[in-house]
Amino acid sequence: MNNKLSNAPIYDEKWIERLAITIFDDIAVLTKDRHGVSRETYGKGETDAINYLSKLAVKLGLYVEVDDAANVFFSSKPIVNSRYMLIGSHMDSVPLGGNFDGLAGVLAGFLILSYLSKNKINLSLPLKVIALRGEESAWYGRNYIGSKSIFGLLTKEDLNSTHRKTGEKLSKAMQSCGVHINKIQSSISLIDKENIELFIELHIEQGPILVDRNWPAAIVTGIRGNNRHHNIICKGSAGHSGTIPRYLRKDAVFAGADLITRMDDHWNTIQQHGGDLVLTSGIFHTDSDHHAMSRIPGEIFFSFESRSQDVATLDALEALLKSECKTIERERGVKFEFDDLIKSSPAELDEVIIKNLLDAGESLGFERASLPSGAGHDAAVFANVGIKTGMIFVRNDKGSHNPYEAMDIKDFMAGLSILKKFIIDY
């Protein structure tokens, strides 16, 4: 046997899996924090991870290009004035987050592209992979920054939003990463969306359903939109806890708790009537400089988020929130002050893509598993500008947005194999 041939690398599923493990491990070390990883939106961790992939792409013989929003594209060769398929996800993480949120989707596309290139497999249309910046809202209170930039959708308010700790404006952070901020400010689309045949995003499931149903992977049927208030203030009147009777109190904590309880009742009613809805108040606190065991709290600060696949449900919840606040103001003598509402629209995914992804999975021996996405994703931006879009979820134990994300590499390979077959068969 020819020694050169026998020693030649075999670019198969095992090669993909080995490379996947190496990349996941390397980026985890590169972006590690005191717990988990931190890949800050338009910050060091996100940039380091993108640079790692870009250098590896060159070694693998792939073509790398960077757009004016510092998103990075990978392809087997330059694609000019031609329709193409696009796979991708985001490279940032929440502070002290897990290693697989976002990265799994970028890496799935990256590995499929590398596999196709090494094996010289021709497709009906060229394939690009995108590593998106800034999907997480945890850093600047704004989500989908990279994907919105692509389509000229970032607003002045978005660009003026400030970092959760440093107070730095998003626009400045973007410039420091090489973004051509003038183009972003002018709301110019950075690519011709008519050239994008479809967009597919693989992502870890960030809830417990795949684990509960023992599905290694599943196809997403739709993406919930959300309404978000990052900082609502309830103002009452501080006082001595022992001297003021209930009927004279203006207790901000009790007023806030009353509001959350009422909204929970509305949530329950809507669900009983078949509506799709989840509500969360993830931030709820008094002022640490003033709170005390024996002090009636005069002020609280809290967030409020509603998510649904139905815009009418989101609008109804916002109206109910404001209405209940007015009622509680009258009953408890407090005042609610609202910040600006931030909206993300629900997204309908392409029915043909959903069916073809299910068919691809079934042909590989997987159950025809599907579910809606409760979390928002970059895929929603692509879908809502009219691009045919699909999503694949991969099983992930121990939740997400925490350091304990536990995606098994075999489950990742299951999702990747479905995506790879879909792309090859398209």
Predicted regions span which residues?
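N-terminal capping segment at the start of a domain
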Residues: 2-43, 133, 158-159, 400-401
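A short beta-alpha structural unit
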Residues: 11, 38-42, 278-289, 308-309, ...
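Zn-dependent metallopeptidase/amidohydrolase metal-coordination segment
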Residues: 12, 23-26, 88-89, 298, ...
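A non-catalytic alpha/beta surface segment that caps or lines the substrate-entry region
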Residues: 31-77
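Catalytic-core environment of secreted peptidases
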Residues: 56, 60, 72-104, 109, ...
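Alpha-helical metal-binding/catalytic segments enriched in His/Glu/Asp
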Residues: 87, 96-136, 228-234, 243-267, ...
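Midchain, well-structured core segments that form catalytic/ion-binding scaffolds
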Residues: 135, 141-311
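His/Asp/Glu-rich mid-to-C-terminal helical/loop segments that flank catalytic regions of hydrolases
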Residues: 224, 240-270, 318, 322-323, ...
